[in-house]
Curated annotation (Swiss-Prot):
Homodimer and homomultimer. Interacts with NEP. Binds ribonucleocapsid by both interacting with genomic RNA and NP protein. May interact with HA and NA. Cannot bind NP without genomic RNA. This is Matrix protein 1. The gene is M. It is a peripheral membrane protein. Residues 165-252 are annotated as: RNP-binding.
Amino acid sequence: MSLLTEVETYVLSIIPSGPLKAEIAQRLEDVFAGKNTDLEVLMEWLKTRPILSPLTKGILGFVFTLTVPSERGLQRRRFVQNALNGNGDPNNMDKAVKLYRKLKREITFHGAKEISLSYSAGALASCMGLIYNRMGAVTTEVAFGLVCATCEQIADSQHRSHRQMVTTTNPLIRHENRMVLASTTAKAMEQMAGSSEQAAEAMEVASQARQMVQAMRTIGTHPSSSAGLKNDLLENLQAYQKRMGVQMQRFK
């Protein structure tokens, strides 16, 4: 796996699924391929994206700044600086300075990532802030190692939280989660349908699923009533894909 592929993988792992994630993936690909060369326009686009947390925007801004060539005097962006200040916690800043001193002696991506993984996400963000604000300088490879370690820390905590939700025994949460997943699958079917001949059938199935979810939410139902809803919808989606000759196992 190339360095930039690894960076893209880690950064995308902390972004919630949806159309915005696909858009960000495309921007990262363009930036890494040297196609998107206007940093000002890119940062303005990033600043106005909805849904993303300030820290995620800060990390993306840091990656764009590292990758896109820019003029020396280009102003640093406030939204990135604020996101990478470690919540203003002096403890994070102290740790960030110690980490920075270690990273300065490091020259490889993997070495930097290993060192960084023993620090908290707050300290890692503060260290990125030091580099972003030009208070310290490290090689691009080392900076990317720091980025990937930060994303790994964040993704780990997101995964723990997600696992807790998936394994929860609370029937109300499980019920709502099934309905949300059914809605998301319906949306995916509508997007895949496009203008094909079978599109009408796919749209019909998706529409029925949405109406069912809406009705269940409106009138309130027993928590077990949604158990088969997502599975039925996935079966319909896979049958539709087979007829279309499309294999998209990732919807499982």
